[in-house]
UniProtKB/Swiss-Prot annotation:
One of its GO terms (biological process) is translation. This is Large ribosomal subunit protein bL27. Pfam families: Ribosomal_L27 (PF01016). Keywords: Ribonucleoprotein, Ribosomal protein. One of its GO terms (cellular component) is cytosolic large ribosomal subunit. GO terms for molecular function: structural constituent of ribosome.
Length: 88
């Protein structure tokens, strides 16, 4: 059994890349359909009105409107409140 490590070996130097998780659109912000609202691992935030959930638990807007965060039965929900179309 060797008592010295071979040349250029190290027990350090391994770390995973940051996954850029978190809330991407905050309460009151206007979003378009399809925009990502929250990137997460597990359901820290649950989908509410007009919000879909992807296979990796990412929450995204199903309709255009304003983001709203709320709590129901100790669950944090993300909703999209549709904004009425303004006649030009």
């Amino acid at each position: 059994m060797a008592h010295k490590k071979g040349a250029s070996s190290s027990s350090n130097g391994r770390d995973s890349e940051a996954k850029r998780l978190g809330v991407k659109r905050f309460g009151g912000q206007q979003v378009s359909a399809g925009e990502i609202l929250v990137r997460q691992r597990g359901t820290k935030f649950h989908p509410g009105e007009n919000v879909g959930r992807g296979g990796d638990d990412t929450l995204f807007a199903l309709k255009t409107g304003a983001v709203q965060f709320s709590t129901k039965r100790n669950r944090r929900l993300v909703n999209i409140v549709e904004t009425e179309a303004v006649d030009a």
